[in-house]
A protein has these predicted regions:
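Double-stranded beta-helix
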Residues: 8, 150-215, 239, 258-260, ...
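Glycine-rich phosphate/pyrophosphate-binding beta-alpha loops
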Residues: 128-131, 140, 215-221
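A short secondary-structure junction signal
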Residues: 119, 124-127, 135-136, 153-159, ...
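Non-heme Fe(II)-dependent double-stranded beta-helix
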Residues: 1-12, 19-125, 132-134, 245
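Short, surface-exposed loop/helix-turn segments at secondary-structure junctions
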Residues: 56-57, 127-128, 177, 181-195, ...
Length: 277
């Protein structure tokens, strides 16, 4: 459970470093599962498995020759019971519920991001919720767990403190040559907005939380180290299906616009009144 000081820090900054929640054996087990999914060794498949910098096809076999890549796997929990169990991690879910001010949580979707050594590419500055144009309101919180130490040298995430309070600015976000964020029309920002990024280094097995409107991104991995992580994007129980655009999860929605987003592909993983899965 998070302390009041931690809750206040998240409210102020839009991100928070949590505890080390996975031991070495648990991390290694998830790494092995990840390798199986990437190599196509599982019967079930995730929703998406691709190089973010190269392809938009629904499923790629990861045997790529691109000079840079960021391996993205969406909903690895659908291909791996071990990752489903991770998504229902009791401490993570309890703390996300605190940060989301909710008594229940469902998986919106999860996401592996793997930046291989030397050739790991950047992830552009962005806000999550504007890229999810089928759900409202913007109350989601993500739990990002490092499967390798994520440090400046291997392309850790960077965050802009307080940016979750500024609204939707996704279309105006860009970066300098040295990966500093900037806003294409800064006059649209609040008068007190300070666009200054800070590194969000996360230890292997540690969890980091961020709000769905927090500006974040990550630069190249030019080191000899891998940078693997599993992010689970959790939606509070009051999240509704409000489609205004396309999304990879759209085909899995079986409710009407305006209704709560529920269903087998959006499993409940936390409820104070029920036993968790």
């Amino acid at each position: 459970m998070l302390s009041q000081a931690q809750l206040d820090e998240f409210e102020k900054n839009g991100f928070l470093k949590g505890d080390v929640v996975l031991g070495d054996d648990e991390v290694e087990a998830l790494r092995e599962e990840l390798d199986k999914v990437m190599n196509g060794e599982t019967v079930a498949r995730p929703v998406l498995n691709r190089n973010m910098l190269e392809s938009d096809s629904p499923y790629d076999n990861m045997k790529m020759i691109a000079s840079e890549r960021v391996v993205q796997i969406v909903n690895i929990w659908m291909a791996s019971d071990r990752f489903l169990k991770h998504a229902a991690h009791p401490q993570i879910c309890e703390e996300v519920a605190q940060l989301s001010h909710t008594n229940s949580l469902r998986i919106w979707h999860d996401q592996i991001q793997y930046k291989p050594p030397v050739t790991g590419g950047p992830t552009a500055w962005h806000q999550d919720h504007p890229l999810w144009p089928i759900i409202q309101p913007a109350d989601l919180v993500s739990a990002w767990v490092a499967l390798d130490d994520a440090v400046i040298e291997n392309g850790c995430m960077w965050m802009v403190p307080g940016s979750h309070k500024w609204g939707n600015h996704q279309r105006y976000l860009s970066s300098t040559k040295d990966f500093k964020p900037f806003h294409k029309q800064p006059e649209m920002l609040p008068n007190n907005a300070v666009v200054e990024a800070v590194p969000f280094e996360i230890k292997k097995g540690q969890v980091g939380y961020h709000h769905c409107l927090t500006w974040h991104g990550s630069p190249h991995n030019r080191s000899e180290m891998k940078r693997r992580a599993i992010a689970v994007h959790y939606m509070p129980g009051h999240t509704r299906y409000e489609p205004v655009g396309e999304h990879v999860m759209l085909s899995y929605v079986n409710v009407k616009p305006g209704e709560l987003l529920v269903g087998d592909h959006f499993p409940e993983v936390f409820n104070k009144a029920k036993v968790q899965i």
